[in-house]
UniProtKB/Swiss-Prot annotation:
Name assigned to this protein: UPF0353 protein Mkms_2500
Annotated Gene Ontology cellular component terms: plasma membrane
Domain VWFA: 98-294
The UniProt record lists the keyword Transcription regulation: no
Localization of this protein: Cell membrane
Length: 335
């Protein structure tokens, strides 16, 4: 949590938990203070003339004279927590991840069940996604129908990606597996270039499609979509699928109306096999919401951040109050 004026505070994920051993010292000091205070009170009761004492100091604030010591102990506890180094989850923009946007450009994308058409809506939302993706992400673009083509290799140049999106052209057949395999190859290539240390950069495939794979006819074939999804899982690349369209879509082929209903189930299985996530959208507005969700997932990562500042400031504040209370109540520091 974050408190006004104090900053982030957390009581978990301590980087230096051994600092809590200092609480033994704090407890010992508190115990010593109590022992000294009780002994002092006994001496006063034994030797003091109570009638004279009451006449000299009848309104002495006995109940409050321990407040400075209490505040001092509290401040030491708070400062100990700060020194132990609590942490909290912090979302920061990624700066070396790879995202491959894989878009289906088969003839079914001509369907107008989504205005103005499935492809036109996909182009508009995909360009917005490219604009809003965090700048450090390397974004690539693949278009696929019967075959897959890398239109833009992963790059931080968003204008190149948006220009290529505008130029997408429809083609025959749907080879979803080819699109996924091509994306994996592009990720491996760029990973060898921008990878830092011994591990490749984190990567993800965003697969945008409206229908069932037609080439090959069996998605479990070596070049099929399900085989590609399993390969993606083995390579640690989850696939986020977006099934776009309605059950009522159709296209005109040779002056005949051909139904092209969206196939949510196949895309969901691709996502499940790759340990990714499946999304559905049946309008441009829903598609924008899906892309916004993905942007938050892909563009940021959660790391451990410092959460000791709030404890440090609160401890310093209580320590200052202890000193002030000592001056006002006893005209001296507690002890």
């Amino acid at each position: 949590m974050t408190l006004p004026l104090l900053g982030p505070m957390s009581f978990s994920g301590f980087e230096h938990p051994w600092f809590f051993l200092f609480l033994i010292v704090v407890l010992a000091l508190a115990g010593l203070y109590v022992i000294v205070a009780l002994a002092r009170q006994r001496r006063i009761l034994r030797f003091a003339n109570m009638e004279l004492l009451e006449s000299v100091a009848p309104n002495r604030p006995n109940r409050w004279r321990h407040l400075p010591a209490i505040l001092l102990v509290a401040s030491l506890v708070l400062l100990t927590v700060a020194m132990a180094g609590p942490t909290r989850d912090v979302r920061v923009p990624r700066n070396r991840a790879v995202v491959m946007l894989v878009i289906d450009v088969s003839q079914s994308m001509r369907a107008t069940d989504v205005s103005p058409s499935r492809l036109a809506a996909a182009q508009e939302a995909s360009k917005q996604f490219a604009d809003e993706l965090t700048p450090g992400i390397n974004l690539g673009l693949i278009a696929y129908a019967g075959t897959a083509t890398v239109l833009v290799s992963p790059t931080t140049n968003r204008e190149a990606t948006k220009t290529a999106i505008d130029k997408l052209q429809l083609a025959d057949r749907t080879a979803t597996g080819e699109g996924i395999f091509t994306a994996l190859q592009a990720i491996a290539t760029v990973g060898a270039v921008i990878g830092g240390g011994d591990e490749p950069p984190p990567a993800r495939i965003v697969l945008f499609s409206d229908g069932k794979e037609t080439v090959p006819s069996n998605p479990d074939n070596p070049k099929g979509a399900f085989t590609a999804a399993r390969t993606a899982k083995d390579q640690g690349v989850p696939i986020s699928t977006i099934s776009f369209g309605t059950p009522y879509g159709y296209v005109e082929i040779n002056e005949q109306r051909q139904p092209v209903p969206v196939d949510d189930q196949m895309l969901k299985k691709i996502a499940d096999l790759s340990e990714g996530e499946a999304f559905t959208a049946s309008s441009l507005e829903q598609l924008r919401e899906v892309y916004a969700n993905l942007q938050q997932q892909i563009g940021y990562e959660t790391i451990k951040g410092d959460a000791s500042v709030g404890w440090l400031r609160l401890g310093a504040l209580v320590l200052a109050l202890s000193a002030l209370a000592a001056l006002l109540l006893n005209r001296r520091l507690p002890g």
